[in-house]
């Protein structure tokens, strides 16, 4: 980098390289456990019931809630990113049970539980200490898009001391990317 003041060069040119940061845990979605439903983590991270604060996997899904309806919305797939060294990816799919549509989902945090049959709680966020400033957040996705299909990706980084609890029955708890 070189400092320019009023478009004039000043000082000596110095080169540096940014530190290589650590990857998010299970960033390639290579680790999955099937314990009544699919979890994107190792078996020892599932906890006693796979939900809430007892679940310590970095990534969470709505599978524990969907499981009550006999469906799975997120599962491992043998379809890795082209050029990667991995063998897996996460397959997110929309399912329907009892007239309720459940979209495939994947988030950092834990599913908290079901209430009112079709509503649930999600604990968004996990402690993660970056050892370098992220240069970029990149991910690979592919999809089979049907009529009316939509996809949304959100990335939110913060300095929180705890998770953010979302109650799908209370819009005031929803994540708003505009704020």
Regions found by a protein language model. Give the residues of each.
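Extracellular recognition modules
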Residues: 2-6
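Disulfide-rich extracellular repeat modules and their boundaries
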Residues: 7-9, 33
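Extracellular and select intracellular beta-sandwich modules with Ser/Thr-enriched
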Residues: 9-17
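Aromatic (Trp/Tyr/Phe) and Gly/Pro-enriched flexible surface segments
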Residues: 16-134, 138, 149-179
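Short amphipathic, basic-aromatic surface patches that mediate peripheral association
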Residues: 141-145
